[in-house]
């Protein structure tokens, strides 16, 4: 394709997006094609090709049209209650075998102490996830253990929003106890879990999953569990682990599956939906060596992340309006830049974060509210605290 033809096609595609049309996967793939993506890692933000700048400006304009100029944030705390895990994902530096150096499993008093500390600092949300610990049972059953965690937290802090337990954890509990996904989700919901993290998605393409996380749930199971959550009234987030072995085509397939999932929830009038999309760039600093060698870089390539951020807004924005970068993975400066490439939310304070930090991420584990606010105002945008479901506080 000549440069002139590329520019014409890009202009047509971007104009369609600005007019409110959903782009096809083929159209969207052109935005990530090698012709528009000439070794971005070596370019400065001030010397981008015209094609990349056009994509960035389109994403920024769509963000403004779809959700406005206000940038939101949430005061929350991550609690990773155990890193003991039966699985061995090739990108994970977090998991440990029981009894090995670095393994941990918090008891309920430690979890409550962390929740109390979060409340004292103004948190409205606890995000709680952990490894798949086969010993995490009550009377030989997994679900009662998880329900006990939820009830103890809710008994002490009834106002806290519990954003807890990924689709992978739901499948693990269901498998261990021989019950359905619906049974597990309904029980967690009734105990006080208000929403489900859309993690463990990685890339929703089984060819990728067989290499990077062969023990994890497959694409169909992830989609089934998230769709079941929506049907049962439990909102979810959505994520993509990017920048490792996946191709642009597989990235677009992932986005297409998320869009279709959200369309189903809306068309069937389910009581819950996907609330946000978060791009999670691969961090390989401390990841297992085989994948590090295959990927060829230990930290995210910022411009690659920004381009995919923009393309995600362009492809998903009609259906999933809230887009968030990961300051843990790309740093606060990178997250601030992402607010110009289609993101409207800067995420949360977290207060602690183990999974990405143990992989070697540069962003740290805690962000003061004032730092988030200053990052937003430095762009000439207004900030607004929100809750987990994007209600202004």
From Swiss-Prot:
Subunit structure of this chain's protein: Consists of two subunits, CofG and CofH.
InterPro entries referenced in this protein's UniProt entry, alphabetically: Aldolase_TIM, CofH/MnqC-like_C, CofH_family, F420, FO_synthase_su2, rSAM
Keywords annotated in UniProt: 4Fe-4S, Iron, Iron-sulfur, Metal-binding, S-adenosyl-L-methionine, Transferase
Gene Ontology molecular functions: 4 iron, 4 sulfur cluster binding; 5-amino-6-(D-ribitylamino)uracil--L-tyrosine 4-hydroxyphenyl transferase activity; 7,8-didemethyl-8-hydroxy-5-deazariboflavin synthase activity; iron ion binding
Pathway: Cofactor biosynthesis; coenzyme F0 biosynthesis
General function of this protein: Catalyzes the radical-mediated synthesis of 5-amino-5-(4-hydroxybenzyl)-6-(D-ribitylimino)-5,6-dihydrouracil from 5-amino-6-(D-ribitylamino)uracil and L-tyrosine.
The protein's required cofactors: [4Fe-4S] cluster
Name of the protein: 5-amino-6-(D-ribitylamino)uracil--L-tyrosine 4-hydroxyphenyl transferase
Catalytic activity: 5-amino-6-(D-ribitylamino)uracil + L-tyrosine + S-adenosyl-L-methionine = 5-amino-5-(4-hydroxybenzyl)-6-(D-ribitylimino)-5,6-dihydrouracil + 2-iminoacetate + 5'-deoxyadenosine + L-methionine + H(+)
Keyword Acetylation: no
Family: Belongs to the radical SAM superfamily. CofH family.
Cofactor binding, note field: Binds 1 [4Fe-4S] cluster. The cluster is coordinated with 3 cysteines and an exchangeable S-adenosyl-L-methionine.
Disulphide linkage map: none
PANTHER family found in the cross-reference section: FO SYNTHASE (COFH), LIPOYL SYNTHASE 2
Species in which this protein is naturally found: Trichodesmium erythraeum (strain IMS101)
Radical SAM core domain: residues covered: 71-318
Family matches, as HAMAP family: FO_synth_sub2
């Amino acid at each position: 394709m000549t440069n002139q033809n590329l520019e014409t096609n890009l202009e047509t595609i971007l104009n369609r997006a600005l007019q409110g049309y959903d782009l096809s996967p083929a159209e969207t793939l052109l935005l990530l094609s090698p012709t528009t993506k000439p070794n971005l890692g070596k370019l400065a933000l001030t010397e981008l090709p015209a094609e990349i700048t056009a994509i960035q400006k389109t994403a920024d304009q769509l963000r403004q049209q779809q959700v406005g100029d206000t940038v939101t944030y949430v005061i929350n705390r991550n609690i990773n209650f155990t890193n003991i895990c039966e699985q061995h994902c090739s990108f994970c530096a977090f998991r440990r075998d029981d009894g090995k150096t670095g393994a941990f499993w918090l008891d309920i008093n430690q979890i409550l102490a962390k929740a109390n500390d979060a409340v004292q600092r103004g948190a409205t949300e606890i995000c709680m996830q952990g490894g798949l610990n086969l010993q995490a049972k009550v009377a030989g059953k997994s679900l009662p253990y998880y329900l006990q965690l939820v009830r103890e937290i809710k008994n002490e802090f009834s106002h806290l929003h519990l954003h807890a337990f990924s689709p992978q954890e739901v499948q693990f509990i269901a498998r261990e106890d021989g019950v359905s996904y619906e049974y597990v989700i309904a029980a967690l919901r009734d105990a006080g879990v208000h929403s489900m993290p859309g993690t463990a998605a990685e890339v929703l393409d089984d060819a990728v999953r067989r290499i990077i996380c062969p023990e994890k749930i497959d694409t169909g199971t992830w989609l089934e569990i998230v769709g079941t959550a929506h049907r049962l009234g439990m909102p979810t987030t959505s994520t993509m682990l990017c920048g490792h072995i996946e191709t642009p085509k597989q990235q677009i397939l992932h986005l297409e599956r998320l869009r279709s999932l959200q369309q189903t929830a809306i068309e069937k009038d389910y009581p819950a939906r996907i609330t946000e999309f978060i791009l999670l760039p691969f961090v390989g600093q401390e990841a297992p060596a085989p994948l590090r060698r295959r990927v060829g870089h230990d930290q995210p390539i910022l411009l690659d992340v920004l381009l995919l951020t923009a393309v995600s807004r362009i492809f998903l924005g009609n259906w999933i309006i809230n887009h968030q970068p990961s300051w843990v993975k790309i740093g606060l400066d990178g997250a601030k830049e992402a607010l110009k490439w289609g993101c409207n939310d800067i995420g949360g304070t977290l207060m602690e974060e183990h999974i990405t930090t143990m992989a070697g991420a540069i962003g740290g584990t805690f962000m003061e509210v004032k730092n988030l606010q200053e990052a937003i105002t430095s762009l000439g945008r207004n900030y607004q605290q929100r809750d987990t479901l994007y209600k202004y506080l």
